[in-house]
Amino acid sequence: MKAKNLFLSIFALGMFTACETGTEQGGGNTVPDGSVLQGRITEDVVLSAGSTYKLNGEYIVSSGATLTIEKGVKIEAVYDDVVDYILVEQGAKINAVGTEDSTIVMTSEKAEAGAWGGIHICGYASTNAEGGLGSSEIGNAQYGGDQDDDNSGVLKFVRIEYSGYAFDEEHEANGFTFYGVGNGTCVENCQAYKGSDDGFEFFGGTINVKNLVAINCSDDSYDWTEGWRGKATNLVAYQQPADVVGYECDCLIEADNNENNYAAQPISHPILKNVILVGNNGTKQGIRIRRGSEVELSDVIVCGKGKPITVESEETELALLNKVSKMNNVISSAALISEKNIYTNDKFIEDGNRVDETLKYESFENIKDVCDWITGSWVKY
């Protein structure tokens, strides 16, 4: 069967309603066009439609405050020795609502992966970090709690470019990072473009997301850990070879529960549906599920990797074998690799999945043609 026909069969039911949670209403002090964004805000602030702002250093939204970003806003991080990032603390909100043709763009003065620090949102939803609380990798802000319906606001039609600033060997900034974010938050139609770390990362929480695109993120396109249990619908990851973008890209999905305690509760168990993952034919790993993570995958295509799907750790493989985790209609360009030989490629096929399919994509256009949710100009490629 041709690749496009595979896409069409998977995405025929890919029409979905808008977020029913979150808050889009703005209100507050309007920041003039051309202003510099820096420091901490403690009251409601509005970045007005079509305006351009400079981000210089940290920009922190404190508990009780709301940062409203209207359609068409451009935030440009200053390129110097000071790391630039946006941090939304517990109890604060960000309402960033663009449109498909008037996208909110967060970028850098220098069009280079790793130029700035991205956006970090901390919520009160549960996580399996030690003691149920954690500190954000960027900004050292607390996250976690027991409010799984917590609402940190809205992100719609937002693109983050050239993030991934390296603080040290252990800490690099993703494009979008969600720390203990609850399912009262709305995230849809967002893109991570040419970052030097992950595109989207989830540290616990219950946030649901849809219509996400990660292009040429040099670490993982999608990454989760610490007990993320949300739903993700319509995900795309696309990687080009190093001789095109100037660097290699790692996993398309990297899935963990907790690296220090594979059985930590709550266990990571997201539900992913309608997913297209295209690798760069350079690095090996495509979908890597490990360290006790559970998952439900349905209607997925993964290709362009030597090891398109790898399952690691006894806990992860037993969850698949016992149908706690599920894979259905997952189409892979090569066999599933089982580290512990518990959930084998034969079991994978028995569960209604397919391997060794010829799946080749010459450009992002091949993906866009079969994703009717990628319309307008909000996706850059």
Each predicted region: which residue ranges?
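Sec-dependent N-terminal signal peptides
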Residues: 7-10
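Extracellular beta-rich repeat passengers
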Residues: 23-67, 78-93, 98, 107-197, ...
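Short active-site-proximal "capping" loops at secondary-structure junctions
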Residues: 74-75
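Positively charged n-region of N-terminal signal peptides that target proteins for export
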Residues: 1-5
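C-terminal motif of bacterial Sec signal peptides marking the signal peptidase cleavage site
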Residues: 15-18
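Glycine-rich loop(s) and the adjacent beta-strand/alpha-helix scaffold that form part
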Residues: 102-103
